[in-house]
Amino acid sequence: MVQRLVYRSRHSYATKSNQHRIVKTPGGKLTYQTTKKRASGPKCPVTGKRIQGIPHLRPTEYKRSRLSRNRRTVNRAYGGVLSGSAVRERIIRAFLVEEQKIVKKVLKLQKAKEKVAPK
């Protein structure tokens, strides 16, 4: 006769958060063991890519006590938050915006000089 199994917790619905596996104990009994959800790891909010160099853990495992800082982040601007390509894109965009401001300023000065020169 097969041994009957009963959930160890009161949560009795077969949902994603209530997944179990059957395990045989050293005493020879079969019991349910709660399985953890698989971690997908952090994603870049801009590109949607996985962030390289950071382990795939559940959100609670990223807390200070469980993971050291150098394992939680990547050593660059926006490290651990944005992917490398997104950071590169931001830097280039910021540089081009600054260049555009400088060009505008120079053109304004040249226009002012032209107005003053004919008089």
Curated annotation (Swiss-Prot):
GO BP annotation list: translation
GO terms under cellular component: cytosolic large ribosomal subunit; mitochondrion; plant-type vacuole
InterPro entries, sorted: Ribosomal_eL34 (IPR008195), Ribosomal_eL34_C_sf (IPR038562), Ribosomal_eL34_CS (IPR018065)
Stretch list, region Disordered: 30-51
Keywords: Ribonucleoprotein, Ribosomal protein
Gene3D superfamilies referenced in this protein's UniProt entry, alphabetically: 6.20.340.10, 6.20.370.70
Top-level taxon of origin: Eukaryota
Identification of the protein by name: Large ribosomal subunit protein eL34y
This protein's encoding gene: RPL34B
